[in-house]
Amino acid sequence: MFDDQQAPQLRLFVISDSIGETAQRMIHATLTQFPDISQIEIKKYPFIKNEEELMHILNRAKELNAVVVTTLVNPDFNIAGQHLAKKLQIPYIDYMSDLIGIIQQQTQCNPILESGALRKLDENYFKRIEAMEYAVKYDDGKHFTDIGEADALIVGVSRTSKTPLSMYLANKGYKIANIPLVLEVDIPDEVFKHKHLKVFGLTASPDYILNIRNERVKILGLSGPSNYNSMDRIREELIHAEEVFEKLNATVINTEYKSIEESAFYIEKCL
């Protein structure tokens, strides 16, 4: 970002008792407002363990005329850093303590003062992304190779909310596979190999499913009778579904007039 032969226009020291990602993001967001600054040096000092280490870094910042940016959650580190920065007369920006103090004052809630809490949130974020990718891959019986990795398997006839429920749970970090139950298609042997799989069977009354399928047919602009929205066919499918539920030892959930959130809440309790 800068020429070794020339002093940078701006030096920034990023100090944190965690990885320091929060401060780096704030710095990069701020620097976008200064496109004319071409020579910038950013030095990172993550995982600060003691005040002596902090003091050494601040003295070095004084020597190099650097701006210090911190996300120190440990209040003792913060106080020590602020005092020395004031004594050394160096710019010291503390992203965490002011906002923590204001939120504490407004809510009367005490902060956990845990370093790396944001990183844990990031880990949860990536877990959700992985779960979403899994749910898409294993939606509607598309794949079975790694179905044993699923936190839950959802099975049911068409229009019992298998996909919406899978995606909702995936957004909460659960790996969900779902398989449609069709009269002419057997459940793959691969599914029966994984005895640990928690299986949930979705069902509803024939009238309820018929109404939903009729609406689906209208949306698709189709006309004329078909097996898809035939009451006799739906009854056969539901009888077949009950047999499959028993074979898979599935927990049965009636989704009739039930929100996705309600069904998901029940599944979460079972996981």
Curated annotation (Swiss-Prot):
InterPro entries named in the record: Kinase-pyrophosphorylase (IPR005177), PPDK_reg (IPR026565)
Transmembrane segments: none
EC number: 2.7.11.32, 2.7.4.27
Top-level EC class as recorded in UniProt: transferase
Pfam families the UniProt entry points to: Kinase-PPPase
Domain of life: Bacteria
Chain positions recorded as ADP binding sites: 156-163
Keywords: Kinase, Nucleotide-binding, Serine/threonine-protein kinase, Transferase
GO molecular function: ADP binding; ATP binding; phosphotransferase activity, phosphate group as acceptor; protein serine/threonine kinase activity
Catalytic activity of the protein: N(tele)-phospho-L-histidyl/L-threonyl-[pyruvate, phosphate dikinase] + ADP = N(tele)-phospho-L-histidyl/O-phospho-L-threonyl-[pyruvate, phosphate dikinase] + AMP + H(+); N(tele)-phospho-L-histidyl/O-phospho-L-threonyl-[pyruvate, phosphate dikinase] + phosphate + H(+) = N(tele)-phospho-L-histidyl/L-threonyl-[pyruvate, phosphate dikinase] + diphosphate
HAMAP family reported for this sequence: PDRP
Family, per entry: Belongs to the pyruvate, phosphate/water dikinase regulatory protein family. PDRP subfamily.
NCBIfam families in the cross-refs: PRK05339.1
Functional summary from the UniProt entry: Bifunctional serine/threonine kinase and phosphorylase involved in the regulation of the pyruvate, phosphate dikinase (PPDK) by catalyzing its phosphorylation/dephosphorylation.
Protein's name according to its UniProt entry: Putative pyruvate, phosphate dikinase regulatory protein 1
Gene source species: Staphylococcus saprophyticus subsp. saprophyticus (strain ATCC 15305 / DSM 20229 / NCIMB 8711 / NCTC 7292 / S-41)
Lineage, broadest ranks: Bacteria, Bacillati, Bacillota, Bacilli, Bacillales
